[in-house]
Amino acid sequence: MTYAAPPTDGPPKGRELFKAYLRKVGSGEHTSSGLTREEAAHALELMLDGAASPAQIGAFLIAHRIRRPEPQELTGMLDVYRKRGPQLTTGKPAISFGMPFDGRTRTAPIYPLTALVLSSAGLPVVLQGAGRIPVKYGITAQELFACLGLQLAGRSVEWVQAKLNACDLALVHQPDHLPDAETLIPYREDLGKRPPLASLELLWTAHQGEHLLVSGFVHPPTEARAWKALDLAGETNVLTVKGL
């Protein structure tokens, strides 16, 4: 009787690379170590590109949540969003609001009205958001603007930039402008918890140039990590608001 020779190629390269990052964030409290900025960026890119397996991605997201992301890890992931997402510009200083992508369920969000007041006064406003996503499935920025008669979803980056130039208002909509990130949404539903990506979404702005970044937080440790991460990312004008 003969036996087939075992495969020699082994697991795909991306999965092997990802194992090293998973070991770092998934070990016990005495052996777990943080990723460098570059490693965190690479880990996120492997997830966005589907180079890591679904099991690896789920394990990484929940382990990272339990351990809590370190500032340089958030900065590394922010580097990826900055590179892959749209880059909007204005001829004058702008303001960008970092809002929860999974929306609101218990409070009435006023930031669409705030954005309209600011833009009508000539201050460019850049917002980022997505469709309804786990775990809250709250009302989203694009839905709120639609209620006011502004259809901001389903638009090209060129259209968004043109309206920012003309009206001082822009909404970057993840399904349209950062579709790679949409591939990670089902994991939120399966895990039942918000992964560190939710913290990343509060720190990201698509605006390039001088701006004030307003970011919300709930827990004080989250605020401290956000400040350090944004400082590493070169953000010099930041305002954090509890519960925003």
Where do the protein language model's features map onto the residues?
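Active-site-proximal beta-alpha loop/turn segments in soluble metabolic enzymes
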Residues: 61-65, 100, 141, 205-213
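Residue-level signal for inorganic ion chemistry
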Residues: 60, 145, 201
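A generic, well-ordered mixed alpha/beta core segment in the N-terminal half of proteins
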Residues: 92-162
